[in-house]
C-alpha cells in the first residue's frame, strides 16, 4: 500500500524546516546505509551531531502525530527518529534497494521496519529528476510531491531515487514499526477506516451499521496487532 498525504507540514513549519536545513552542514549518506545499499547510495545526510537536527525531528514528528491519515495508514507502534537527506551535484542518486528489516533504536535494541515514510522539503520545480520510484505488489509508482507532503509505503518495497540532474532535492525519511506487521492486513484496515469515515459523514455516528462496522474494525485490529 502506497499512500500520499498532502500538507503534512503547515506553511510555517515548512518555512522553519527549510531555514534550519539551510543553516546545516551535510555529510555522506553512507553513514546509514546497509550492506546492500552501501553500493547504490550516493547522497548527503545531516549528521547526528548537527546543531538543528533535534529541532527538525521534533517538528516532523509533531506534524505526523497530529495527522489522522498518517496514523490510519501506518498504525505506528514505534517511530524511529527521522533522518534528513539531500540529493545534489555529484551526490545525486540512490539506486534500487530494500530498507533493512531491523533498525537500531537510539535508546538501544532494535525496531522492526514495517513502514517507511518520506516528507518532501523541496518543491518539484526546484530540481530535475529525483523521483522516488517504489516497486511492490501494488505496481511501480514514481513519487515527486510538493514540499510539506509525505508518502507512506511498506519498508519491504524495492525503491530508488533517480539521479537529480539540476537543483537540490531535500527530504526527511523515517522508519517505523507498525502495530500490524502484515502489509495486506494494514491495507484492509485502512480501506475499512476510510469507508467508515465516508459512511459516518453520510448517515451519522449513531447509525447501527456504523456502530457494528466500527466494532469490526477494532476487533480486527485487536486480532492482528502486535501491541
Swiss-Prot record:
Binds 1 Fe(2+) ion per subunit. GO terms for molecular function: 2-oxoglutarate-dependent dioxygenase activity; iron ion binding; L-ascorbic acid binding. InterPro entries: Oxoglu/Fe-dep_dioxygenase_dom, PKHD_C, PKHD_hydroxylase, Pro_4_hyd_alph, Pro_4_hyd_alph_FE2OG_OXY. 2-oxoglutarate binds at residue 169. Its EC number is 1.14.11.-. Keywords: Dioxygenase, Iron, Metal-binding, Oxidoreductase, Vitamin C. One of its GO terms (biological process) is DNA damage response. It holds the Pfam family PKHD_C. The keyword 4Fe-4S does not apply. It is an enzyme of class 1 (oxidoreductase). Residues 78-178 form the Fe2OG dioxygenase domain. Its cofactor is Fe(2+); L-ascorbate. Fe cation binds at residues 97, 99, 159. The keyword Metal-binding applies. This is PKHD-type hydroxylase azo0608.
